[in-house]
């Protein structure tokens, strides 16, 4: 299904034939905005039913006003939201009555952070089989949602899916060496911690993520 959907996307790019009846891929500018809104609304519904809820997003920018408003709504409903946004973020986290359940972290290190990851609890505890996990080419910006061709791809391979949930996201959460926390004032504060954990070093040295395993000889910064 994913390969067939991808073929339709490339046909769209080369011959302007609109994709029809896509099975797995969600693409911009056709449906990604509505899809993201629906995914956030689903987490709101789970929270209101006292079921596990949560959103984890890794991207380069969060700018779209309507999506930001929907994330505020989710926060007020009790959805815990972790945003790893390397660049510009127009959302204000940790504002009482608005975004108390939202944490925004910028990790500035060796990697340029072009990978985008979208994880939704989907009524299950974090790292459970219920979680919806996607990789994407798109940031949460108007140009990515409304004017460019972008894709959101569900992770069906259990190995890769597990790596995202049990290694990549936890490493981003625990990173202190290269992390800056966005405050409600719009200022970034450098995180300080005795452990000084570096997610980028972890990605390069972890056997299942780097391809090098224990063969890595050099200490990364």
Each model region followed by its residue ranges:
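Prokaryote-biased recognition of long, low-complexity C-terminal linker/tail segments
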Residues: 5-14
């Amino acid at each position: 299904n994913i390969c067939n959907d991808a073929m339709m996307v490339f046909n769209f790019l080369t011959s302007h034939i609109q994709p029809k009846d896509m099975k797995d891929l969600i693409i911009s500018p056709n449906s990604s905005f509505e899809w993201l809104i629906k995914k956030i609304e689903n987490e709101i519904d789970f929270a209101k039913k006292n079921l596990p809820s949560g959103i984890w997003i890794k991207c380069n920018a969060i700018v779209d006003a309507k999506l930001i408003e929907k994330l505020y709504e989710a926060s007020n409903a009790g959805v815990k939201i972790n945003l790893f946004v390397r660049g510009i973020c127009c959302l204000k986290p940790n504002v009482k009555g608005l975004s108390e359940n939202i944490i925004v972290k910028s990790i500035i290190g060796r990697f340029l952070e072009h990978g985008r990851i979208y994880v939704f609890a989907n009524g299950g505890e974090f790292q459970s089989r219920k979680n919806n996990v996607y990789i994407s080419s798109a940031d949460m910006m108007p140009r990515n949602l409304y004017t460019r061709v972008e894709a959101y791809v569900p992770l069906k391979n259990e190995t890769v899916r597990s790596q995202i949930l049990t290694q990549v996201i936890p490493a981003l959460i625990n990173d202190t060496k290269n992390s800056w926390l966005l405050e409600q004032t719009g200022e970034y504060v450098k995180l300080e911690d005795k452990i000084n954990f570096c997610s980028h070093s972890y990605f390069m040295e972890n056997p299942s993520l780097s391809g090098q395993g224990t063969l890595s000889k050099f200490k990364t910064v």
